Amino acid sequence: MLDKIGIPKRLAWGFLGVVLFMMGDGLEQGWLSPFLIENGLTVQQSASIFSIYGIALAIASWFSGVCLEAFGAKRTMFMGLLFYVIGTAAFIVFGFEQLNLPVMYVTYFVKGLGYPLFAYSFLTWVIYRTPQSKLSTAVGWFWIAYCLGMFVFGAWYSSYAIKAFGYLNTLWSSIFWVCLGAFFALFINKDRFEKKKRKRSETAEELLKGVTILFTNPRVLTGGIIRIINSIGTYGFPVFLPMHMAQHGISTNVWLQIWGTIFLGNIVFNLIFGIVGDKFGWKNTVIWFGGVGCGIFTVLLYYAPVFSGGSLAVVSVIGFIWGGLLAGYVPIGAIVPTVAGKDKGAAMSVLNLAAGLSAFVGPALAWLFIGLVGAQGVVWIFAALYLASAVLTKCIHIPEEKAVKEETSPQYAS
């Protein structure tokens, strides 16, 4: 049954493990910033914590492939688990409870090294163990598991756990969920990953190529920039948007439910825009649905509670559409490897790095500009960047799409 819908049966427990791990990792995303601000930190200080976390994500995303080649999938995933547990426990005990900013910087950085090593190593495992004819679907299911856990279940769980356990214990419970996820992915999952034998020089050469391609192929660099812009709202909004919503009658708990609904829309439309991209064209999909669509609805999401009097229905509908339009960037995962020619592996490294950097850039923009132009100004900056990504996409020349579509796996966009 699972094989028929594209999930490799031998790795089914691993997919469940990714859902649970990412649920634990993402459960504080929608409420940590407003909690820290309510307890004495400034918006800029809160944003700086998330920016440093984003740097850790970028580093771990970049090196996840190299670690897998050196240590194997399960060991690399276990390393990710250790980074997460140690970083989270230290963050709570020495940073969170005492609001010690320097300690929070260090410990949240360590935590940020965790999930890329865990999740992206499993993704590589899936790629190695799935027949080519079913690879695109299997990769799609991985991203569904990833988004369901991090953005949907994590937010929904927090909206109830905070009421039942309080903020501190909810954060502690994240360790339970990531350990449960690791148990399914590493122990209940009995599949064995046999990594390809490669010389150390070959691994180093591939890593270096992931840097040099940015200079030798400007189209790959442009695609990486577009991928960063794709997720600036995903990681930037949680820094300040919950406080804006609260000013208009939408509490943090209700906001968490809205945030989960937003990314439920993202998951649904990730599937839809994969099909739309094939029919409407990769570039057209990114330009009109991703760039222009996100630019418009980013602004609407900010002003929705203002003009609707805090209407939950209005904000939820606009948020659902915004989350869906983020998926308009799905074809960038096909465009970048295509324009890279033979260097598809290096192109995927660039996309992984860009996905990690977006977790830095979004909060960093809030940190830099919220004191100058306020939350409203930051939203307009986000909108302008989304529109700029449409222009950048227009400038990328790609070969005839029909000749390469069947060779390319999707990159989910959030």
UniProtKB/Swiss-Prot annotation:
Induction field: Induced by sulfate, part of the yoaDCB operon.
Membrane-protein topology: Multi-pass membrane protein
Positions in the Extracellular compartment: 33-47, 97-107, 158-167, 241-255, 308-316, 365-375
Keyword DNA-binding applies: no
One Gene Ontology cellular component annotation held by this UniProt entry: plasma membrane
GO terms, molecular function: transmembrane transporter activity
Residues in compartment: Cytoplasmic: 1-11, 69-75, 129-136, 189-219, 277-286, 338-343, 399-414
Origin superkingdom: Bacteria
Gene3D superfamilies (UniProt xref): MFS general substrate transporter like domains
Family recorded in the similarity comment: Belongs to the major facilitator superfamily. Sugar transporter (TC 2.A.1.1) family. CsbX subfamily.
UniProt-recorded name of the protein: Putative transporter YoaB
